[in-house]
Structures are given as C-alpha cells and as structure tokens.
C-alpha cells in the first residue's frame, strides 16, 4: 500500500469528500483522507493523506492557513456563501475608508461564532444538519488568530471586496465577512473563496486530481519541522514493535525515527517532556 500525502488543487463545486474519489481510485485504496475541509463553493489547496499518513490528519489540520476571499456587501445568505438563501438585504454599502478602519479590528486574537451552516458539533450533531432541519441553537464564540489581512481590491459599484487573509486553524472566513459587514452597519456573504496556503505548502505546488501521478505523492522527508532521529540498529526491532526507546522530545513535538541507512521507521509525538506516543509505525 502506498503511503504519503498529496497537495491537491480542489475545484470549485466539489466537496472535499468528493475530491478524494479519484485519489482512492488511482491508488486503489480506501485509506485516503483529507486534512481540513474546504467548502463546496471554495477552491484551492487541500491536503490529502494516503495510507498510514491518514494518522497525521490532526497535525496537518493544526497548520495555519491563507485564503483569498471575495465579500459581497448588501446581501446575506443563510449559509454566508453563494449557494444559500438570501435572508438579509440592505442598500447601504460601506465606503473604502470605513472598511480599512474596521479591518484592523479583525487582526490579532479575535472571538468569532462559526456559521450556522458549518461542521461544528452541537450536542453530538453537526450544526449544518440542525440548520437544515430548522432547529434553533446557539454556537459559542471561539478564539482564533488572524495574523494578517491585506485588501487586494474594492469595487464599490459591484460591492465586492477582495482580501488576502492569513489565519490560524478553525478560522471561518464566512464569519469574518458576516462580522465585518455588521460592524459597518451592512451585511455580506463570501462570494468566492480560495485557499492558497496550508503551513509551508502553497497552492502553486498543488495538482489537479486529473493530473495525479506517483510523483505527486510526498513523503515525510519534506516536513522540515519534524526532526529526524537516528535509531541504533540494536533498537530498530523495538521501534517496529512500538516499544519505548529513550528519546528527548517536548510535548506536542513530532519526530521521525530513522535507521542509519535512512529507512523511515516511525513517527512519534511528544505527550510530555521526554514521553511520547507512536503516531505511525512503518
């Protein structure tokens, strides 16, 4: 079975789950997952995990993200995207000076409520399922970090604001559109969204599913943030059997265990000072 991860350029109009179908077919395995949902209306980089690398999903999901988004003022949909039902309208379209002033409030550590149509769990159910069934529920605000917002363009005549946003995991761009518009006494939704970066991985290095090849599969060697630890030949069998080997490691740190010949043996994650768990054993 193949093991590795892929930088996929997800096309607009497909769900993240649907995007995995050709990958499963190409590698002839159902052991394929993704690390971080991209909405159906969105496009951009999606990290797909193949084989044992699916166990690294939490790591990839924890990485910072970058998006290019377009907000349309004057209309709000229930989903806060182009596919939703219009629930709010206004003739007031904010001016550029006010937008630039308010954007500063959305940089740094902020609290936001995820959209009602999202995959957030509410008492064991997905929020979007409750919303589809017309259920009333509240979503608690969550703390996220927005590192930078760059205004790319603003067309007052079409009410379209284009932004580049760098943020932490769990940040909802649709919530930023909603909250920014409300702060300007208007309303808005995200008319287009493209994810351009996940951690160090960029959209320009991704591939469309139709262009998949064995060369598209990336190994752990590319993860520069994972320190490589050389294991003595006398301890290789211990590692392959998931036994403890003394290794210096910090909490939440990932390390790759290799033989002196360069064979990747395992991936470990620190759970305390110099204590770890095996994430993958090859």
Swiss-Prot record:
GO terms for molecular function: RNA binding; tRNA pseudouridine(55) synthase activity. Its EC number is 5.4.99.25. Keywords: Isomerase, tRNA processing. One of its GO terms (biological process) is tRNA pseudouridine synthesis. It is an enzyme of class 5 (isomerase). Gene3D superfamilies: Pseudouridine synthase (3.30.2350.10). It catalyses: uridine(55) in tRNA = pseudouridine(55) in tRNA. Transmembrane segments: none annotated. The active site is at 39 (nucleophile). The keyword Nucleus does not apply. Responsible for synthesis of pseudouridine from uracil-55 in the psi GC loop of transfer RNAs. Belongs to the pseudouridine synthase TruB family. Type 1 subfamily. This is tRNA pseudouridine synthase B. It comes from Borreliella afzelii (strain PKo) (Borrelia afzelii).
């Amino acid at each position: 079975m193949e093991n590795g991860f892929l930088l996929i350029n997800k096309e607009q109009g497909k769900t993240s789950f649907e995007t995995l179908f050709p990958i499963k077919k190409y590698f002839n395995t159902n052991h394929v997952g993704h690390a971080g949902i991209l909405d159906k209306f969105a496009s951009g980089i999606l990290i797909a995990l193949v084989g044992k690398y699916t166990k690294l999903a939490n790591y990839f999901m924890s990485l910072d993200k970058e998006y290019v988004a377009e907000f349309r003022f004057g209309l709000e949909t229930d989903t806060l995207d182009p596919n939703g039902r219009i629930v709010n309208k206004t003739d007031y379209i904010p001016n550029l000076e006010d937008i630039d002033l308010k954007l500063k409030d959305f940089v740094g550590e902020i609290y936001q409520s995820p959209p009602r149509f999202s995959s957030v769990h509410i008492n064991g159910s997905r929020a979007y399922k409750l919303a589809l069934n017309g259920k009333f529920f509240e979503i608690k605000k969550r703390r996220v970090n927005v590192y930078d917002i760059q205004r790319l363009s603003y067309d007052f005549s079409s009410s379209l604001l284009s932004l580049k946003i760098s943020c932490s995991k769990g940040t909802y761009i649709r919530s930023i559109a909603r909250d920014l518009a409300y702060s300007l006494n208007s309303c808005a939704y995200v008319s287009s969204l493209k994810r351009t970066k996940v951690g160090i991985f960029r959209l320009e290095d991704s591939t469309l599913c139709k262009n998949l090849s064995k060369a598209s599969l990336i190994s752990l060697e590319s993860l520069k943030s994972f320190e490589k630890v050389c294991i003595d030949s006398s301890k290789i069998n211990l590692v392959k059997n998931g036994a403890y080997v003394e290794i210096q490691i910090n909490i939440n740190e990932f390390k790759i265990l290799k033989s002196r010949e360069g064979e990747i043996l395992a991936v470990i994650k620190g759970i305390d000072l110099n204590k770890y768990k095996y994430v993958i054993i090859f």
